[in-house]
């Protein structure tokens, strides 16, 4: 849940054209980990209501699942960063609750908290459960399944990406694909 676009030295700040998944070192490293078989889940960033607006590295990396934030009613959190990448890929990939997320404080009291740093681990936990149920999938297959199971999968955009993932739909889709493959 780490991303940035501005530096102490403004000459090093990222520009939109840098968001190609290859320019930023952290994006290249996230993509490398994904290529080795890890599921990398990144927060989209909280720059949506500022002048930058765009997803921050490493959320622009290829083969990572970048998560934006919505409220519990499915409405975009105004701070959630948007895409797309400079090379035209859809980002964020999916959305999860990040506005009014229920989190437990160090004092043991549950409170609401805001940020894609909350939507990302929520999605990460759901993806981990899905992978546990479908251990034969590769990381890339799993991420593609999560995208295809979003409520906007038929028309992804640069704000919601593929939308809110229905993990039961993802599981059922995987089982159907497996049955189709086994039946051939």
Model features per residue range: what roles?
Residues 1, 9, 35-37, 60-63, ...:
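Subtilisin-like serine protease catalytic core
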Residues 1-60, 89, 106-114, 118-120, ...:
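Substrate-binding/access-modulating region of protease and related hydrolase catalytic domains
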Residues 1-2, 32-34, 39-43, 65-68, ...:
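Structural recognition of the beta-strand scaffold that forms the well-ordered cores
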Residues 4-7, 46-50, 71-74, 85, ...:
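Solvent-exposed loop/turn segments at secondary-structure junctions
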Residues 45, 169-184:
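Secreted peptidase-domain scaffold signal
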Residues 54, 98-160, 164, 168, ...:
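Hydrolase catalytic cores
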Residues 56-72:
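Structural recognition of alpha->loop->beta junctions
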Residues 80-100:
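Internal glycine-rich alpha/beta core junctions
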């Amino acid at each position: 849940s780490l991303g940035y676009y501005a530096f102490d030295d403004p000459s090093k700040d990222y520009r939109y054209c840098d968001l190609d998944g290859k320019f930023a070192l952290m994006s290249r490293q996230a993509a490398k980990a994904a290529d080795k078989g890890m599921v990398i889940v990144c927060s989209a960033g909280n720059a949506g209501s500022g002048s930058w607006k765009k997803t921050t590295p490493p959320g622009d990396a290829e083969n990572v699942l970048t998560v934006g934030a919505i409220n519990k009613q499915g409405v975009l959190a105004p701070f959630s960063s948007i895409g797309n990448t400079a090379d035209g890929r859809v980002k964020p990939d999916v959305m999860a609750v990040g506005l009014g997320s229920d989190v437990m404080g160090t004092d043991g009291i549950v409170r609401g908290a805001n940020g894609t740093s909350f939507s990302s681990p929520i999605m990460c936990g759901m993806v981990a459960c899905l992978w546990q149920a479908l251990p034969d999938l590769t990381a890339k297959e799993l991420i593609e399944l999560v995208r295809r199971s979003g409520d906007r999968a038929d028309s992804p955009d640069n704000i919601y990406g593929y939308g809110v993932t229905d993990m039961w739909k993802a599981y059922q889709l995987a089982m159907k694909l497996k049955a189709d493959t086994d039946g051939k």
